[in-house]
């Protein structure tokens, strides 16, 4: 209703101004601005829905002030371009329509009416309401009901008897199991769901709507609200350190807690969260690659579900045989948006909807088959009688190729339980949410029936039942939940641990790199993560007077304030204000002690603009003074005009990447010498090793042979044609996720370059 009203008010404003208001520059500008705001808000809502499937939420609010560089972002480039073009077109058309009768005499009354209608359209729009509620949630001091409903459980289970297997299905919401809407999509896992305790109304609340947030909610009974963006949690050293979560209780009760997934454990800080709360045995992409049958069988995120669940079964079997009390948590990944991945061992590789194949539905059908096979192995084992199996989605599906069909249904998260000790078959329609999952499991295991804000759905009352406006209530509690981090409010002295890549201050520890915004009563950490912009881009968003402390590799800040460190990959500390004074200090000790020293200086807006512009220079456009191309830092020597076919800097150098260009091309500003030596320090990847690699300058070609280890080779070139471009053509680029950013499409690697130097040998 609100949406229709806002559109009606918008159209009425346009029509009244265009046909009745007449010509007046001020009224035209004011009306166009407000109507344009309406358009921007609704395009923002549409774009946010595309990424999150949940409108404008906390993640979007963060992204509005930070660049999105995360997993699979390349698949969203075309929609993003489309939205930008649509915005330009709509603004142009809107301006043209409003000025249709610009020669008509100006009428103040109609102009005022049009402006008021435009303001009303903005106020009535769902986008404005969502943003307003989010902004309010940032400004609130908390909610008195938090202290009433937040409860800490006992730290142990009195007489534990059952082992626990907890399966998180990535985005595997209960909606997929509606056989009327999606016939025969989930037959195997759906049949198992119908054998157990099936909770049919598990809603999604703010702060529980992405993987790490869903895990925190289900184990700690609280949403993931933090003094930083949730997926940046990898930078913290402890996770809700004061909370008692399900893993803590299990460990205190004698359980050995295991977690197995196919992706890297560091992503979004899952390793930090789990280690902080009772898990001593963690297996992710790095840990599994030495034990799985086929280490090369991977998707963009890590190992496929069939591989992960095979390893989980091996763990279950070994732990059961040992007689040790245990919990085994596992997380799938094949159903990750936007398209998902299909394991090669499943039979259900294709699912058609509306008469054509649908990739997201296909991955769901495949993944549920893999999960069901894993569960059936447990059920067929002699240890099932001592086991509780839990299957839940981590969150609702985000925008994927099935999303528009899901949205036509009543959407809920998946949560069902299979008890080997006491089979129960029942569908419970009680209103609940993800925070109730851990408390329900704890209740079954013999512990308390509450964790945090979560309540057992078997013997307690969920906040979803208590409050009709539970989403607004949870947002109101956001400041209370953030306070649970016990995060410091000031920084004076700090220590940088060069060997552990950590910074410590006021009792808190963070992984490096890190950017801090410092005010009188608040220290805001801005870590670097897969979903956030590089820290220099985040710093560029600071106001001229904002105090900052920036700990990063020296070369990243050297181009601004310390040219002598332009090639250093050591840690440096910079602090100051972008519009005032800045300092850069080299971390030259294993335990480096620092102090904050913000000077109250005059703000120079020219300096501020220059700093911001320099911070925003993209990596490939950075230039430094050097007599060679050093590949483990961003940019290139001043003599280089441009380059292509080269991946991002890593700690050792850079790979060639045929996804960015079939050949490595380095174009210099001036012709290369008539006669020169080309000194190349590099290594080869995969089948490129021990094969001739063509290297060309003008009409002359030499060959380079590299092994898998780094070596230095000198090639001799004559350049009679004054060519200025060096070309290296790896013969067999290999598509791989080796060293890739989590969730990104595979790179096609050829050679790994450490340094290239041109030595003039003209006599």
Curated annotation (Swiss-Prot):
Higher taxonomy: Bacteria, Pseudomonadati, Pseudomonadota, Gammaproteobacteria, Enterobacterales
Protein name: Phosphoglycerol transferase I
Tree of life domain: Bacteria
Membrane topology: Multi-pass membrane protein
Catalytic activity: a phosphatidylglycerol + a membrane-derived-oligosaccharide D-glucose = a 1,2-diacyl-sn-glycerol + a membrane-derived-oligosaccharide 6-(glycerophospho)-D-glucose
Record keywords: Cell inner membrane, Cell membrane, Membrane, Transferase, Transmembrane, Transmembrane helix
Record-level GO cellular component terms: plasma membrane
Chain segments annotated as transmembrane: 4-19, 26-48, 76-98, 110-132
NCBIfam families xrefs: PRK03776.1
């Amino acid at each position: 209703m609100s949406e229709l009203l806002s559109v009606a008010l918008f159209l009425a404003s346009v029509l009244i101004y265009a046909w009745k208001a007449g010509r007046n520059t001020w009224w035209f500008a004011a009306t166009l601005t407000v109507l344009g705001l309406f358009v921007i808000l609704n395009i923002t809502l549409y774009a946010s829905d595309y990424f999150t499937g949940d409108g404008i939420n906390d993640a979007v609010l963060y992204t509005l002030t930070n660049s999105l560089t995360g997993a699979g972002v390349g698949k969203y480039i075309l929609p993003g371009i489309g939205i930008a073009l649509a915005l330009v077109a709509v603004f142009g058309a809107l301006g043209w329509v409003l000025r249709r009768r610009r020669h008509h005499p100006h009428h103040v009354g109609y102009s005022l009416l049009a402006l008021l209608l435009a303001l009303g359209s903005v106020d009535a729009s769902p986008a404005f309401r969502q943003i307003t509620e989010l902004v309010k949630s940032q400004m609130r001091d908390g909610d008195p009901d938090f202290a009433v409903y937040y409860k800490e459980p006992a730290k142990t289970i009195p007489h534990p008897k059952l082992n626990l297997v907890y399966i998180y299905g990535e985005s595997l919401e209960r909606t997929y199991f509606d056989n009327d809407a999606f016939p025969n999509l989930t037959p195997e896992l759906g049949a198992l769901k119908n054998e157990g305790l099936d909770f049919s109304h598990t809603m999604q609340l703010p702060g529980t709507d992405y993987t790490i947030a869903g895990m925190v909610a289900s184990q700690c009974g609280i949403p993931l609200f933090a003094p930083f963006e949730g997926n940046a949690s990898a930078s913290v050293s402890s996770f809700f350190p004061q909370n008692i979560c399900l893993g803590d209780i299990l460990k205190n009760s004698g359980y050995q807690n295991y977690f197995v997934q196919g992706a890297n454990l560091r992503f979004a800080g899952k390793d930090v969260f789990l280690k902080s709360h009772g898990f001593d045995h963690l297996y992710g992409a790095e840990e599994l690659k030495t034990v799985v049958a086929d280490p090369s069988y991977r998707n963009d995120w890590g190992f496929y579900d069939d591989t992960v669940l095979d390893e989980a079964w091996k763990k279950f079997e070994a732990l059961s045989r040992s007689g040790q009390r245990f919990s085994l948590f596992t997380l799938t990944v094949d159903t990750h948006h936007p398209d998902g991945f299909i394991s090669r061992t499943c039979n259900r590789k294709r699912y058609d909807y509306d008469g054509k194949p649908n990739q997201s539905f296909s991955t769901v059908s495949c993944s549920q088959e893999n999960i069901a096979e894993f569960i059936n192995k447990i059920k067929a084992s002699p240890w099932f009688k001592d086991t509780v199996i839990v299957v839940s989605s981590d969150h609702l599906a985000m925008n994927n190729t099935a999303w528009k069909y899901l949205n036509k249904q009543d959407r809920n998260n998946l949560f069902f339980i299979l008890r080997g000790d006491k089979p129960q078959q029942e569908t419970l329609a009680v209103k609940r949410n993800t925070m109730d999952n851990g408390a329900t499991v704890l209740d079954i295991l013999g512990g308390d029936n509450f964790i945090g804000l979560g309540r057992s759905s078997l013997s307690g009352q969920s906040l979803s039942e208590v409050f009709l406006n539970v989403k607004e209530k949870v947002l109101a509690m956001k400041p209370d939940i953030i306070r649970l981090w016990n995060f410091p409010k000031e920084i004076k002295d700090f220590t940088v641990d060069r060997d552990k890549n950590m910074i410590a201050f006021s009792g808190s520890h963070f992984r490096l790199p890190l950017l801090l915004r410092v005010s009188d009563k608040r220290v805001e950490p801005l870590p670097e993560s897969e979903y956030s912009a590089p820290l220099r881009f985040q710093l560029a968003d600071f106001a001229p007077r904002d105090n900052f402390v920036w700990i990063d590799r020296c070369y990243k800040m050297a181009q601004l304030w310390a040219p002598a460190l332009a090639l250093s990959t050591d840690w440096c500390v910079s602090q100051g204000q972008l519009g005032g004074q800045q300092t850069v200090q080299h971390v030259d000790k294993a335990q480096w002690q620092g102090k904050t020293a913000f000077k109250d200086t005059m703000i120079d807006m020219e300096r501020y603009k220059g700093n911001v512009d320099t911070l925003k220079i993209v990596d490939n456009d950075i230039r430094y003074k050097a007599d060679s191309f050093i590949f483990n830092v961003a940019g290139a020597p001043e003599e280089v005009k441009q380059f292509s076919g080269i991946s991002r800097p890593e700690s050792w150098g850079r790979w060639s990447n045929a996804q960015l260009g079939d050949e490595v091309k380095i174009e210099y500003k001036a012709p290369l010498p008539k006669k020169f030596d080309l000194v190349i320090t590099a290594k080869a990847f995969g089948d490129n090793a021990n094969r001739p690699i063509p290297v060309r300058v003008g009409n002359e070609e030499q060959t380079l042979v590299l092994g898998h280890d780094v070596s230095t080779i000198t090639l001799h070139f004559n350049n009679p044609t004054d060519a200025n471009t060096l070309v290296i053509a790896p013969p067999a680029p290999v598509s791989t996720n080796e060293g890739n950013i989590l969730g990104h499409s595979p790179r096609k690697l050829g050679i790994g370059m450490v340094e290239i130097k041109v030595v003039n040998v003209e006599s």
